[in-house]
Amino acid sequence: YGWNAGVNPNKNLNNVIYRLKKQLVLAGLPEEEYVVLESGICRWSSSFPVETDAVRFTECISMAKESAGAGRIGFLRTAERLYTGELLPEFSTELWVIERNLQLKGMYQQAVVELGEYLRQAGEYQEELRLYRKAGKLYPFDKWQIQEIDCLMLLKEYKEAYDVYRNTAKLYCEELGVPPGPEMVSRLRRIESQI
């Protein structure tokens, strides 16, 4: 799709592959065929193992599912730290990218919920706060700020909890045109009772 008449897509793709190879060598990788085009399909080919954060993330989630106790928590912690947000944002309108992003986001959210519960029970409120702050930055409309406020309240950081409430309320009003929901309002009442 998107090719003008008379343009050979394979020739253009070969040019892109050639330029990529040159860029990889300039970046310090050994000179070899990194991308191979066979029957119109590109595949990665290198003499050394290559690991991506997305693959490593899904492996950690799978290993967590097969584990229990401290091992499970360790895999969830690693997975959570590997997750940095949307996969291939430049291609976010491609159907396969949308589907994969939804899968990865779901895995991430489940990991955050389970880790958050573990950290709360363990009394690791600072780490729990870091966890929810990251989740809230990645997905500001998924209500992670509620857990962030709860952590701040446990840490007796009432002013900071109020600031999170105020900033979240402003974000929801400006971006979505809706006021904060009942869960957020109940947090405001709890904050006000402590200030």
Task: Map each language-model feature to its residues.
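Intrinsically disordered, low-complexity protein-interaction/activation regions
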Residues: 1-130, 134-143, 160, 173-175, ...
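Tandem amphipathic alpha-helical repeat scaffolds
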Residues: 117, 150-154
